[in-house]
Amino acid sequence: MSSPQNTSCPPSQHSLSFTQGLLLGQLSVVLLIGAFIKFFIFGESPSSSSRGISQRTAPRKRSYSVNSTLFRDAASRSLKESASSNVLRPVPSSSTNTKSILRKTYYNAIPTNFQKNSRHRLHHSTHQPESLDWFNVLIAQLIAQYRQTAYILKDSPTSSILDSLTETLNNVDKKPSWIDRINVTDISIGEEFPIFSNCRVIAVEDPNSDGGRLQALMDVDLSDDNLSLAIETNLLLNYPKPASAVLPVALSVSVVRFSGTLCISFVPSPGTTESSPHLPHPENQNESKPSRQDPEIPTNKDGVRSGIPKTSLAFSFLPDYRLDISVRSLIGSRSRLQDVPKVAQLVEARVQSWFEDRVVEPRVQLVALPGIWPRMGRTGVRAQEDHDAVSIDSEDPATKATHSGFTPVNANRDGLQASRDLNMEGLRYRRGNAGDEATTDEYERLTRGDTQSVGEQLRIPGSLPGAPAVA
């Protein structure tokens, strides 16, 4: 009999692997819990800028839910059923109120305070006065452009400043009969620019607007400039017969200095509110009527835009202005009288009266604000800097606009159309029609029967070298 075999069992590895797995699992759970606590509980929240960037860059997905579809259908149905006047949301009644505007723009202005004797006094705002340095730069650029335009058009027969002044001074309805034709001998439009400063906003009473009206006051000063106008004319003695005696007169008027307080405010259209006693009626303002009507805006039979209220910019000067004028005169032909004081007083009084009758309180000048709605007729393209060789005296308006820095869109369209026409011409010449557009040499080769020339003429543009010609 065989003895029982004492077989030794190998050591089990399952207990060791189970222990390792348990420890590894516990360790991973601890790491996950620690990472969660560190990054989600004690982590810093993202900044508002990063949240805004992520929201802007996130892809937009349309929602095709039933509720959104029903809402869109109901909204479109309500828009179709409602009147056109109810589509635009109503403007709050306090939108033009002075207090509301000042509160929303964070400007502290003290309104009018009434005294016991029923008189009111204007208080300046508690806001610090503005220096208006940026405004001076803009006004200087505008005046410089006007001066340059006036100099460029000095030789124009219709739109020069000399012809305009001569026509105005020789107006038959205003010029007396004892003054001969007035000839302008010298014009100087100056070299310096007005300086605006100390701007402040005040609230004034206006019966035509709700809550009063805001008015900007700014000091303006113009000195050491060369604004002058020189004329020559003859004084006629029409008794006992017309032009029985003639007295030559030469005058030169120069503005030495001007300073004052400019008042600027916005007033509503006189057509929508009652006419103010200090504002002229639109029927008396022939210059305020547009000379060129916009085809997109309806007009009535008189050519006036109908149904569109216009807001105007009103500006004037306070009565405490200063206008210093220098007048030089020369009277006579042989024994001339120079710089007569009485003539200087008369001319200065006339200029002062002309100025006060137009832009000194309580009289104001109204300028209708233009429409700022974007239109293709006013659209331009900013040109590049490579226009040094372009002549400014060119008669092409597109070239002038390009030289000034902007090119009208119409000019771009014309150039694009011209390039298209040129390309079409090139395509026609490539086809080589012998009866219409072939040159004289090509026609002679065709009449001689030169097939090689014909094949070269009828070769497709862009074909490979050595490719067979089109039959």
Swiss-Prot record:
It comes from the Eukaryota. It is found in: Endoplasmic reticulum membrane. Residues 43-471 are cytoplasmic. Keywords: Endoplasmic reticulum, Lipid transport, Lipid-binding, Membrane, Transmembrane, Transmembrane helix, Transport. GO terms for biological process: mitochondrial genome maintenance; mitochondrion-endoplasmic reticulum membrane tethering; phospholipid transport; protein insertion into mitochondrial outer membrane. The keyword Endoplasmic reticulum applies. Signal peptide: none annotated. Residues 280-295 have a biased composition (Basic and acidic residues). GO terms for cellular component: endoplasmic reticulum membrane; ERMES complex. Disulfide bonds: none annotated. Residues 1-21 are lumenal. It is a single-pass type I membrane protein. Residues 128-370 form the SMP-LTD domain. Pfam families: MMM1. The chain crosses the membrane at residues 22-42. Residues 271-306, 395-415, 448-471 are annotated as: Disordered. One of its GO terms (molecular function) is lipid binding. Residues 401-410 have a biased composition (Polar residues). Homodimer. Component of the ER-mitochondria encounter structure (ERMES) or MDM complex, composed of MMM1, MDM10, MDM12 and MDM34. A MMM1 homodimer associates with one molecule of MDM12 on each side in a pairwise head-to-tail manner, and the SMP-LTD domains of MMM1 and MDM12 generate a continuous hydrophobic tunnel for phospholipid trafficking. Belongs to the MMM1 family. The SMP-LTD domain is a barrel-like domain that can bind various types of glycerophospholipids in its interior and mediate their transfer between two adjacent bilayers. Component of the ERMES/MDM complex, which serves as a molecular tether to connect the endoplasmic reticulum (ER) and mitochondria. Components of this complex are involved in the control of mitochondrial shape and protein biogenesis, and function in nonvesicular lipid trafficking between the ER and mitochondria. The MDM12-MMM1 subcomplex functions in the major beta-barrel assembly pathway that is responsible for biogenesis of all outer membrane beta-barrel proteins, and acts in a late step after the SAM complex. This is Maintenance of mitochondrial morphology protein 1. It comes from Arthroderma otae (strain ATCC MYA-4605 / CBS 113480) (Microsporum canis).
